[in-house]
């Protein structure tokens, strides 16, 4: 009986380690695809500007399972992104975020955080046109979780928010709360 218990324990431990190893992405290989404003804020999440269809193919081959697109329907990617992503076996999710119309808000930040939590350790790419909206929503999430204004901005920058204009939008949004 002790032997069976030890075997089950070993299988559980090694199975968990294998699953953890599968969930981290080959960040270096993905970065070689030269995606605009590529960031790797987590071992299983990359943040980018708009990838091309070929770049999505590379990411799918390298372990990305889910795509979260923050672009609005009026922004043309030059191809049918949803169809391309799903044809590669990845799930596609869209949270349309418009900067000028108040889209940088707590509801959109929470929607993004809910998806990231739902996907657990699976490989995820989050993108908009440049990566700035990704970072802006992360800033709001960090602030909502108790981070200071400056730490929230720093974390947003780590996720791709490079625009000073958008950093100001985040500051203004957070100061209203």
PLM feature segments, named:
Residues 2-10:
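Sec-dependent signal peptide recognition
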Residues 11-19:
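Hydrophobic h-region of N-terminal signal peptides that target proteins for export
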Residues 124-137:
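A phosphate-binding catalytic loop at a beta-strand-loop-alpha-helix junction
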Residues 20-124, 139-177:
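Cys-dependent protein tyrosine phosphatase-like superfamily
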